[in-house]
UniProtKB/Swiss-Prot annotation:
This is Small ribosomal subunit protein uS12. Component of the ribosome, a large ribonucleoprotein complex responsible for the synthesis of proteins in the cell. The small ribosomal subunit (SSU) binds messenger RNAs (mRNAs) and translates the encoded message by selecting cognate aminoacyl-transfer RNA (tRNA) molecules. The large subunit (LSU) contains the ribosomal catalytic site termed the peptidyl transferase center (PTC), which catalyzes the formation of peptide bonds, thereby polymerizing the amino acids delivered by tRNAs into a polypeptide chain. GO terms for cellular component: cytosolic small ribosomal subunit; fungal biofilm matrix; ribosome. The gene is RPS23A. It comes from the Eukaryota. Component of the small ribosomal subunit. Mature ribosomes consist of a small (40S) and a large (60S) subunit. The 40S subunit contains about 32 different proteins and 1 molecule of RNA (18S). The 60S subunit contains 45 different proteins and 3 molecules of RNA (25S, 5.8S and 5S). NCBIfam families: PRK04211.1 (NF003254), uS12_E_A (TIGR00982). Pfam families: Ribosom_S12_S23. GO terms for molecular function: structural constituent of ribosome. The lineage of its organism: Eukaryota, Fungi, Dikarya, Ascomycota, Saccharomycotina. GO terms for biological process: translation.
Amino acid sequence: MGKGKPRGLNSARKLRVHRRNNRWADQAYKARLLGTAFKSSPFGGSSHAKGIVLEKIGIESKQPNSAIRKCVRVQLIKNGKKVTAFVPNDGCLNFVDENDEVLLAGFGRRGKAKGDIPGVRFKVVKVSGVSLLALWKEKKEKPRS
């Protein structure tokens, strides 16, 4: 049988050191302490970011699906990084024009791509300060610029 953990009166230091070393195996702990959310993610740790639309693109979905998912290439204002963002709902790409200012949010699970859209980690939420959902439901109109 193994020795197990120390249980004596004077074993606190040993237990603390052991716990401190083994916490680095936890991915969430490691990411939090190393600050990777600020270093690696294009949003720099925030939930949303504004950007300028560079171009509209269609991305083919992964197998076994067959579709062209409507996306846009966006350059973020805060740091100049270029990202691809999904435009949700049927016909919403018509509301987005090049050089429009859009608000992006995360899309999918913990910074990874969602579903059958490869490499797309963000979605468009607002266009020119107006909610994309409101435009789609025809509750609001896009401001003339």
